[in-house]
Amino acid sequence: MKLCVTVLSLLVLVAAFCSPALSAPMGSDPPTACCFSYTLRKIPRNFVADYFETSSLCSQPAVVFQTRRGRQVCANPSEPWVQEYMDDLELN
């Protein structure tokens, strides 16, 4: 009886650790960052160090600006100031 309880407990632990790894289909990478809202204010340009665009798997497109202090700020890619910052960062 003790052996059955031990084996069953071990199987439950193995299943608990393996199921998240197996839940996504092979070859599908979940998006690393998605934005669900945009900043309402224009960020000062001198605060921005870098940017990246969110994955097409996200529910809405966004540009994520990385500030010099390491914060990430989501912005609407259709805003003119966002496009301007992206162009400027590409040139530098």
Curated annotation (Swiss-Prot):
InterPro entries per record: Chemokine_b/g/d, Chemokine_CC_CS, Chemokine_IL8-like_dom, Interleukin_8-like_sf
GO molecular function: CCR chemokine receptor binding; chemokine activity
CDD domains, per database record: Chemokine_CC (cd00272)
Stated role: Monokine with inflammatory and chemokinetic properties.
Protein name per the record: C-C motif chemokine 4
Family: Belongs to the intercrine beta (chemokine CC) family.
Intracellular or extracellular location(s): Secreted
Disulfide bonds: 34-58, 35-74
Pfam families listed in its UniProt record: IL8
Alphabetized PANTHER family for the sequence: C-C MOTIF CHEMOKINE 4-RELATED, SMALL INDUCIBLE CYTOKINE A
A GO CC term assigned to this protein in UniProt: extracellular space
Major location category of this protein: secreted
Any single GO BP term: inflammatory response
Keywords in alphabetical order: Chemotaxis, Cytokine, Disulfide bond, Inflammatory response, Secreted, Signal
Subunit structure: Homodimer. Interacts with CCR5.
Signal sequence annotation: 1-23
